[in-house]
């Protein structure tokens, strides 16, 4: 095998004619055993190498090469002690191997290096390849599998963090849209898309939320992953939505960006309040009961449905008659507001002199609870 290395059989042949053959053979075996724990075991002034050093490197994690032999790491081992104590016997099972092999380094030529760089540019998330072409094809990704680490995802593909659309699936039957929106936080919504079961009850099945800005969507996603976000006692699982890059979606994205850049307070909610047109009450009729003004909710809803589907109309506690109108889309509220301010229009002639209309705060425009 190696130079100056003698096995037990060779020792027997070398000292065949000696009278102390048994003693020398035993001495050779003892030296072979204790050489595992000695760093400088020698025979005739030469250091033993080969299998013994490899075994010591395996046990004690010492480096003897650059190609995989240093990939073993001892846990709870003491190199300076030759024998293990009783309390260390259980530690023998803690030896573990970090990797199968670290491998050796080999230089790569220019052509293969270009191929490597091209492969790195492809997006990987959690060890799985995600095709770039599927990002804007309307695919829904769960938060746990696609955007777990924002810093990692942002460094590889910033488009993943730019989405502001979140889907809530498997909503319990009998749950209304108002109950879902009352638990949503993070910021104002640009629009809402509702999916219902094809049954006579028309129960709610799925809701797509489009936030007005990206930060609000990210904040709500982190909040929805906690146990705090529950709808009627059921924790819903949010998922990201990536839209198709169609002309309609691009135009909506540009309109939302203009709203954010102008820094105007715009929401999908309109506050409609009765103006004070009656005279101040006299002392003679102070004791009389205050008369309530009549309002036709169906007529009000019909007038504003011309600009978009109305989600709900709710009363507001006020000294004067006041209601809030929530649309499914923020563009519907913007069209209604423009119609109200335009002279000669239908809303202007009917509501401008007797009603005051302005943008109200969205019910979802609340900060999320930071944990």
UniProtKB/Swiss-Prot annotation:
A Gene Ontology cellular-component term: prospore membrane
Principal location class: other
S-S bridge residues: none
Keywords: Sporulation
Single biological process term from Gene Ontology: ascospore wall assembly
Effect noted on mutating residue 62 to H: In strain: SK1
Subcellular location, record wording: Spore wall
Gene Ontology MF annotations: nucleic acid binding; protein kinase activator activity
Coiled coil: none
Signal peptide coordinates: none
Function noted in UniProt: Essential for sporulation and seems to have a role at the time of, or after, initiation of nuclear division. Appears to have a role in outer spore wall formation.
Further remark: Present with 3000 molecules/cell in log phase SD medium.
The name this protein goes by in its record: Sporulation-specific protein 2
